[in-house]
Structure formats: C-alpha cells, structure tokens
Amino acid sequence: MTDLRSDTIRKGYERAPNRSLLRSLGVTDREIELPFIGIANAFNTIVPGHTHLRQLSDKVKEGIAAAGGVPFEFGVIGICDGIAMGHEGMRYSLPSRENIADSIELMVQAHRFDGLVCVGTCDKIVPGMLMAAVRTNIPTIVVTGGAMLPGSSGGKDLSLIDVFEGVGKVAAGTMEEDALKELECCAMPGCGSCQGLYTANTMACMTETMGMSLPGCAAVPAVEAAKLRIARESGEAIIPLVKKNSTARDIVTKKSLENAIRVDMALGGSTNTVLHLMAIATEAEIPLSLADFNRIADEIPHICHMLPAGPYSMQALYRAGGIPAVLKRLEKHLDDCPTVSGLSLYQVARNAMIKNEQVIRSLDAPVSPAGGLRILFGSLAPDGAVVKSAAVPKEIWKHTGPARVFESEEPAMAAILSRQIHEGDAVIIRNEGPRGGPGMPEMLSATSALMGVGYKNVVLITDGRFSGGTRGPCIGHVAPEAAVGGPIALVQDGDRIAVDLFMRTIDLLVDPEVLTSRKAAWKPVMRPVTGVLARYAKTVGQANLGAVLR
C-alpha cells in the first residue's frame, strides 16, 4: 500500500495534538494506523429519498471496518425537488448541487481522508457527490439509495407524476378534487426516490454505468435487503481501491462518460443528465460537448420504455436485471472500462441476465431507433437546447406556431390552467436560466398542467429546466439564456417559432434586422435576490457547459 493521505494528520511527534483529537473519538491504537474513510451521508427527514440513508450508512461503516478501515461519517444537505417544486424554493435546488460538491471537498481535504463513500439518492445530491469525487480525485464509491415502490389505487401503479398531472385534470374539470386527494394519499407509499426514470434514478443509472457504484446498485429499490448488502459491500470495496490508489478519475474518463450517455439514450433518461454529466466532465477536466450527445443518440436505440414516457417503473427494471442487464444488451456499443467493483464493465455485462425482454427490448425491436434525448440547435438556441424526445409523441416532432411569452413560470402556469393557451402555441418561459432564475428552476408544475389539461399541440420552451418526470414537447436549457441576452430574450408574442426534432433544430422565424433592433433596446431582467442566490447569479455559467460556477 502506498503512503496514505491521512498520514499527514497522524504521523510523527508533531501530530500528537491531531492524534489526541482522534483518540477523543474513540480511535484505538490499531485503528490509528489504518486507512481513514469518509462517509458523505445525505440523510435527512424531509426528503423521502433520504429518510433511510442512515441505515445504509451504518452498513457502509460495517463494511469499512470489516475490510480494515476506519469510517468517519459527516452530513451532506439534500433538497427534495418535488417539495421545492412550483414556488420560490425551486430556485435553490440546482445551487445546492454546487454546495454539496463544495462541502464534500472541504471535508475531504481538511481531514485528509484516504477514501470516500458517498451515500445519497436524489436529483442534485448524487451529481454533487460525483463532482466532488472527481474534483478531490481520491478513491470513491457511490451508494445510491434506491427508488420508492410504486403507489397503487384501483389496481393501477402510481407515481408522483400522476399527482402533478392530476392538478391539471382538476383545473380542466376532468377530475374531482376527491379523486386527486386519493392520488395524493396513495401515490407515494414510503422511502426512496420517485418511482420512474426521473432525474434521481437516471443519475443512479449513470453512476453505475460510469463504474462508480457496485453492479446492480442503481435499480435495487430502497426497501430491498439487497440495498443493505450493496451498502456493506461498498464499504468493503473502498479499501482495495485505497490500497491500489485507484482514484475517481481513474474510473470517470471520457470513455466511461460516453458509456453513461449510451445507457442514458437507451433508457430515455432525464434531460437533467445532460446538465449533470457536463458538470462532472468539467470538474474532471474531460472534454465533453453537447454534440457528443447527438452523436451517441444516433448510435444507440431507445430500448427501455420507462416512466414517464412509458409504463415501466424502476421496480420493473430491477426485476428485469437492472443496469447490468442493460449493459449486456448494449455491450457491443460500449467501451470496456474499470469499475469500483474490480470488474471491468464487460465482465459486469457478461455476468448479467436479461430477465424481461419487454422491459429491456432487443436492439432490433426498440421503442425508437434513436436515443431518448436530443440536443437542438438553431437561431433560438445557438448554444443548444435539450428535449426528452422519448417522451414526445411523433406527431408533434415538427411544430411551427406563435409564441406566447412569459417572464417566469407562475404567469405561464396561470394561463395554462385558465385555458388562455391555444392549440398550436409555443409557450416561452424565459428569465428562468442559471443566472436569470437564478438557479434554473424546473417547470414540472407547468408541464404537468399542460398534460393534465389535455393540450395536444402545444410546445413549451424555456431557458430553465424540466423535471425528469416531464413528458411531452418540452424543450429546456435554451442557451444562451435570456438574462445574458440570448435570442430567447428577444422573442415577442406572436413571433413564429419552428421546432423540428427530426432535424434537431429550433428557430425564431423573425427577420435578423428586427432582432438587431430589439437587441439594441433590450435590458436584462434580473430578480432581486440575496444570500446564496445572489452569489450564485454572479458566478454561474451557462447550461450548455453544465451550469457550473466559474
């Protein structure tokens, strides 16, 4: 074993004060010579995906101790995007990713941990942990907390998206409030991340594909005993990584990130993965561009029809063999890469079984011949925009219509629920980007309202984000954003907007001279914010680069 980072705080007579403090924690003479492993635990009692993490972290500790290490646990914040949705709180969600990365870096570097096990589940927590892992570049394993079991009512499986869309149905008069109350009470039966292939679960799948979680981790439900076993085995597995000094950047490489994108395309994952994978690549100093996503989308078919686009929950994916089974299906398209388990990605794939051919379809009978995400470019989004094409009906892949412009989500939501939006419209919600929001809030309330009210031919375009639970023709991450003078800032009511998912284009059909005149008169709309949002707005970059702090 090479010299340990933790030797800095415990070797030599000069470190007697440091050792004295360690002894005050109960560290023994034997333990003071062993590898010190940090456990970044995002447990709290407000996020359903995190209420069970203390139990998982305890298992990680057991594994570390059994393998010859000393565990030291510390806390990490976590925000529930569902609870934060639809109000001012959503502006704080994406900034929390940077806080998580920063706080883990602070703990790892101050205490000179030799290795790190991250225990987290939800949308911004796991990306923040991965950003910290590649930034600090020490041996790291991520234990994702797992999905909640589906809810049930009348023999139908439910997820949180049923409740969000129920709000729109009540507004449209197609559902009674009593029925919505039943959904509210039945949809979310316990701990774990929301049940479909939303952002949290997609990022868990990306983490496993990159090689940063043990095989099978992503799809195991939160309440399964298998999750406890994986947590303990992850604690055991970190010690060999420390002894070999196999660091996070040995695992997270350009090839492993591209493997993650391939699985993302096959699953039809959340648009937020584009933002997070770009951010992880930036932290790891790996060249990755939005063009890479389009290139890979052309190579990989969409083979898993997962919620919200299709009928299958994460529980169904687990029963079908989980991510190892997806890797088996895609093996010929993947690059072989190391994983934290000690197995190569090909070995993981070859050890797997595909247990349900309907959930994990063959490459010859896909849901769609192209991957589930598309990056659009054009005069409205010169630096790109993202759409979950897997969740858009083919009949609206090509759309031209008049713009209905809103300066924030709230008035757009009111217009949707009051049916002031007309079929054929292109709803523009701007000044919701990384800097303009600030915080690039998600628009799940608005998109779910569109679905619930029953619009069939309306597209929604924003410089903000969408939830992984969003379905329908919803285009986000428009870059440059309105707050920095991007073309979306110049759109006026009635302007013609042309979207073509087949050609991957998004255009503002206005004479360039008119746009030049508008740009000369344009002034940025900046919301008055204080504290963390004020600091964030000053330093955050654009969505096409991952919205990382500069």
Swiss-Prot record:
Keyword Membrane: no
Cofactor binding mode and count: Binds 1 [2Fe-2S] cluster per subunit. This cluster acts as a Lewis acid cofactor.
Keywords in alphabetical order: 2Fe-2S, Amino-acid biosynthesis, Branched-chain amino acid biosynthesis, Iron, Iron-sulfur, Lyase, Magnesium, Metal-binding
Record's catalysed reaction(s): (2R)-2,3-dihydroxy-3-methylbutanoate = 3-methyl-2-oxobutanoate + H2O; (2R,3R)-2,3-dihydroxy-3-methylpentanoate = (S)-3-methyl-2-oxopentanoate + H2O
Pathway: Amino-acid biosynthesis; L-isoleucine biosynthesis; L-isoleucine from 2-oxobutanoate: step 3/4; Amino-acid biosynthesis; L-valine biosynthesis; L-valine from pyruvate: step 3/4
Active site: 467
Sequence positions bearing N6-carboxylysine: 124
Single GO MF descriptor: magnesium ion binding
Cofactors demanded by this protein: [2Fe-2S] cluster; Mg(2+)
UniProt GO cellular component terms: cytosol
Pfam families: ILV_EDD_C, ILVD_EDD_N
Main enzyme class: lyase
Entry's EC annotation: 4.2.1.9
Positions bound to [2Fe-2S] cluster: 122, 194
Biological process per Gene Ontology, one example term: L-valine biosynthetic process
The organism's place on the tree of life at top rank: Archaea
Assembly, per entry: Homodimer.
UniProt record similarity statement: Belongs to the IlvD/Edd family.
NCBIfam families given in the database record: ilvD, PRK00911.1
Protein name, entry field: Dihydroxy-acid dehydratase
